[in-house]
Each structure stands twice: as structure tokens, then as C-alpha cells.
């Protein structure tokens, strides 16, 4: 099936009513699933609430014991029974998420599902807003944004991340990680792979103007704390390792430290126009059906090169 590039931001705090009033409104739902996320969930809510009313933000909550931030008031909250992780746990979770997004498509034109530390942004230079770019999924079925993994380059930005200023004004560096060019903008029912990295949808539409910023590695201390929590979840389910969730869930503090330091050792950040033409072409050309998983996927593309995130993105979220 074809793999193609789609061809044809607001400032940090735009007027939500102006965004919602600009032309015909496609019905778009944004959804995520969380445990305890006191830092990233308020960012996720505050960002997407600038584009759609809060009742179009859906939050699946893993367990009634979770504490939600005040920003969640007005969002669609679905509290689920907590399930102790065991073999097959994350596969079952993503099967549930696939079914949930399909259900939402019964009432919405497009559903955008991401982990809470993944933010989709329209390139401010493209001249088209986030909602209009996302709405193109109605024509093509499924859209994947280009993925940038935001890095904490402790040698260049030693200060801890905080919520008193936009994230990308504090973290100006990232790397390419094609695994996060996820088929996360859907106007058709899909069955997601583990982690939502791929799906059974046969066409790849890698949008030239949409970026997914993955924030997992944006702060060293926060990374270690979240990773420790994930390891605790894995341990609660007993033995199982990668059979419980993705391999990244079981990595320890030393591995996380070595990962971030590997970018420091690899050299200074590279300044580019942020179009990443050959990388996009490689992702597109590698599109293939995986019969074992019953999914369509592209090659992984990542290395230890650090890229400077252009200043035009600094105040978006």
C-alpha cells in the first residue's frame, strides 16, 4: 500500500474562542491514558484545551486511587479498575485503547490518541493551524507526525524542568526517533501495536508540518523517578519482563543515565532547517507489512545526534 508525504501555531496562549470560531469545525477528540502524572497531564490538558473544548479531551485513568490535577475539571474522565501488570498486560491495554478510539469515532471525525508525554505541534512556519492539519485525516484515514524526542542535555541546560515557562523554551535540543512517528491521528478504526508505534492501517501519511515532541527524556531527575515507578509496576506483576510491557519499562537508573550521557559524548547539537528531508524519505520508503504482527511499519531511525529545536517552537507549549 502507498506511503506518502502529505503536502498541502498559535502563540503560547492564544484565544481559544478565536481558534474554535475559525471556519467549519471538524469534530476532533484528543485522548490519553494515565496513572499519576502531576507534571505532564496539566501540560497535555492545557495545550489541547486551547484548540477544542475540554469535553473533547478524554482521559482514561488507571485506578480510582489516582490523583488528578485541577486542570482535569471539565475533561471527560473515565476511571478504570487498576490491573496489576503481568504477562500480556500492555498488549491487552493497547487492545483496549484501540477499541476505545474506534468507539470515539462513532461520535467524532478524528481521534488523536497519545501517551501523556507526547505533544503534537503544527510547525508555526507552515501557515496552517493544528486543527486543520489534523482534520486532513478525514481524507487520508490516518496521519503520522514526525517525531522529535526532547533531550535533557545536562551539559547545556543543567536546570531542572519546571512548569513556569514553556517546555521548549527550557529544552532546546532533541533527537529523531522514528519509532514515535506514530499513526496516532485516526479517522478510521485501527488496531494498534504495543506502545501505539504502529497499526494495521495500510497507508503511511507522514505529515510534513506536524511534529510529535516526546518528553520522556526532557528532564533527568523526572526521568529517573518515572522509570522507578515503571519498574515498581513491573515488579508488582512478578516475573515476565518484556512480556509485561515494552523493553523500555524495565531499564534502570544507570541505563537511563548512560543513555542521556551518550548524547553529550556524541558532540554538540546540529543546527538544521528542521525539515529532515532524507530522514522522512527513508521512513517512507521503508514502509512494509509485518505479517507476524499483522501490522504495517517502517524502519526504526535513531542515533546519538542532537539537533537544535528552532526558536519558532519555543513558546508553543
Model region roles, listed by residue range:
Residues 46-55:
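Short, acidic, metal-binding catalytic loop of nucleotide-sugar glycosyltransferases
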Residues 90-95, 122-317:
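Catalytic-site signature of metal-activated, phosphate-bearing donor transferases
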Amino acid at each position: 500500500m502507498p506511503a506518502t508525504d502529505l503536502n498541502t501555531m498559535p502563540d503560547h496562549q492564544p484565544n481559544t474562542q478565536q481558534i474554535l470560531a475559525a471556519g467549519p469545525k471538524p469534530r476532533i477528540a484528543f485522548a490519553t491514558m494515565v496513572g499519576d502524572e502531576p507534571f505532564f497531564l496539566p501540560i497535555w490538558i492545557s495545550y489541547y484545551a486551547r484548540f477544542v473544548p475540554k469535553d473533547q479531551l478524554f482521559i482514561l485513568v488507571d485506578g480510582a486511587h489516582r490523583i488528578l490535577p485541577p486542570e482535569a475539571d471539565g475533561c471527560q474522565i473515565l476511571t478504570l479498575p487498576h490491573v496489576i501488570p503481568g504477562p500480556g498486560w500492555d498488549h491487552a491495554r493497547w487492545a483496549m485503547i484501540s477499541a476505545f478510539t474506534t468507539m470515539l469515532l462513532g461520535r467524532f471525525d478524528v481521534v488523536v490518541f497519545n501517551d501523556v508525554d507526547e505533544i503534537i505541534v503544527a510547525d508555526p512556519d507552515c501557515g496552517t493551524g493544528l486543527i486543520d492539519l489534523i482534520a486532513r485525516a478525514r481524507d487520508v484515514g490516518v496521519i503520522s507526525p514526525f517525531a522529535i524526542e526532547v533531550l535533557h542535555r545536562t551539559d547545556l541546560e543543567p536546570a531542572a524542568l519546571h512548569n513556569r515557562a514553556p517546555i521548549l523554551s527550557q529544552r532546546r535540543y532533541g533527537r529523531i526517533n522514528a519509532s514515535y512517528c506514530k499513526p496516532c491521528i485516526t479517522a478510521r478504526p485501527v488496531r494498534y501495536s504495543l506502545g501505539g508505534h504502529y497499526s494495521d492501517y495500510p497507508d503511511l501519511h507522514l505529515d510534513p508540518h506536524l511534529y510529535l515532541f516526546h518528553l520522556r527524556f526532557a528532564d533527568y531527575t523526572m526521568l529517573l523517578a518515572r522509570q522507578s515507578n515503571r519498574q515498581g509496576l513491573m515488579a508488582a506483576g512478578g516475573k515476565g519482563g518484556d512480556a509485561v510491557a515494552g523493553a523500555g519499562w524495565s531499564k534502570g537508573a544507570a541505563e537511563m543515565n548512560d543513555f542521556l550521557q551518550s548524547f553529550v559524548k556524541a558532540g554538540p547539537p546540529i543546527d538544521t532547517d528542521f525539515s529532515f528531508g532524507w530522514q522522512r524519505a527513508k521512513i517512507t520508503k521503508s514502509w512494509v507489512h509485518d505479517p507476524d504482527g499483522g501490522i504495517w511499519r517502517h524502519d526504526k531511525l535513531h542515533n546519538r545526534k542532537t539537533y537544535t529545536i528552532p526558536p519558532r517552537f519555543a513558546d508553543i507549549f
